[in-house]
């Protein structure tokens, strides 16, 4: 690409030199004509009207200039032809790439013109200016205050399981510390707790039913009561009555024996 641009620059310089030489030749011819016009009138005018020699000279000069240009072009071509290795080293490009390169070079040449550069500078300089509209600063609020909902921390399932186990253990400890017992028979296993003489939920189901009907006696005990004794307790109402009678009779006989003892001692006196 660089060699191609250098060749174009050399051709442009040669063309400029040829145009300068032609202009110089025209200036010389005009000076000769002005000098001949200043001669006295004694000379014949016909000799000056014969332009055949001048035309021949001009043709010879033009031929010489063209031959010199051809020689210079041949020299430049020889210079480029003497270096074939540079182009051989370059990779061969397809036709499409060559056409694209030519199109790019044309675009670059067109852009390098002063008119395009002026247009580009004008477009770059003229930028639209937008006036800023005054806006109130936004108040910084948390999302929780806007939504009105609290963000609760996520608790893992393991932590929840551990918390439930701790609550169970605490409940079991409280149950073991305070175990409800029946105030009459002392049992702690009953399907339902009933109201007794001490207060609500102080008697077991069996004792509470008998207390409500008015048949709760000290001799009555359920069979599964921890304080049950066959000698002095029973869970049947008939046997409870028999035990009460025997107990009352025993108490009466005891009282009678105590009363008869002081009479015997008094008879001796």
Swiss-Prot record:
Induction info: In leaves, less expressed in dark than in light.
Subcellular location: Nucleus
Entry's Gene Ontology BP terms: circadian rhythm; positive regulation of DNA-templated transcription
Disordered, as annotated region: 245-269
Entry superkingdom: Eukaryota
Motif (Nuclear localization signal): 136-143
Family from the record: Belongs to the type IV zinc-finger family. Class A subfamily.
Zinc finger map (GATA-type): 176-230
Presence of keyword Transcription regulation: yes
Protein species of origin: Arabidopsis thaliana (Mouse-ear cress)
InterPro entries linked to this entry: GATA_TF, TF_GATA_pln, Znf_GATA, Znf_NHR/GATA
Signal sequence range: none
Keyword Transcription part of the UniProt annotation: yes
Function per UniProt: Transcriptional activator that specifically binds 5'-GATA-3' or 5'-GAT-3' motifs within gene promoters. May be involved in the regulation of some light-responsive genes.
Keywords: Activator, DNA-binding, Metal-binding, Nucleus, Transcription, Transcription regulation, Zinc, Zinc-finger
SMART domains recorded: ZnF_GATA
A Gene Ontology cellular-component term: nucleus
Gene3D superfamilies: Erythroid Transcription Factor GATA-1, subunit A
PROSITE patterns documented for this protein: GATA_ZN_FINGER_1, GATA_ZN_FINGER_2
Record GO terms (molecular function): DNA-binding transcription factor activity; transcription cis-regulatory region binding; zinc ion binding
Name this polypeptide is given: GATA transcription factor 3
UniProt tissue specificity: Mostly expressed in roots. Also expressed in stems, flowers and leaves.
Location (main, coarse): nucleus
Any Pfam family hit: GATA
């Amino acid at each position: 690409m660089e060699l191609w641009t250098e060749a174009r620059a050399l051709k442009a310089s040669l063309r400029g030199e040829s145009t300068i030489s032609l202009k110089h030749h025209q200036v010389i011819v005009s000076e000769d004509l002005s000098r001949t016009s200043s001669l006295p009138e004694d000379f014949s005018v016909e000799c000056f009207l014969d332009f055949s020699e001048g035309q021949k000279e001009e043709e010879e000069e033009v031929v010489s200039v063209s031959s010199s240009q051809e020689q210079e072009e041949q020299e430049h071509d020889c210079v480029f032809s003497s270096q074939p290795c540079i182009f051989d080293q370059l990779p061969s490009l397809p036709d499409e790439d060559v056409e694209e390169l030519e199109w790019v070079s044309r675009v670059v040449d067109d852009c390098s013109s002063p008119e395009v550069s002026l247009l580009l500078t004008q477009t770059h300089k003229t930028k639209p200016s937008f006036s800023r509209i005054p806006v109130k600063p936004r108040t910084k609020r948390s999302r929780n205050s806007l939504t009105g909902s609290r963000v609760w921390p996520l608790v893992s399932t393991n932590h929840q399981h551990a918390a439930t186990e701790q609550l169970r253990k605490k409940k079991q400890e409280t149950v073991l510390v305070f175990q409800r017992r029946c105030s009459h028979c002392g049992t702690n296993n009953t399907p339902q707790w009933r109201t007794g003489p001490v207060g609500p939920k102080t008697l077991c189901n069996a004792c509470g039913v008998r207390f409500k009907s008015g048949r709760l006696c000290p001799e009555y005990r359920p069979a599964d009561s921890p304080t049950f004794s066959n000698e002095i307790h029973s869970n049947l109402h008939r046997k409870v009555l028999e035990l009460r009678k025997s107990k009352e009779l025993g108490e009466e006989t005891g009282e009678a024996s105590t009363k008869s003892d002081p009479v015997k001692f008094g008879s001796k006196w």
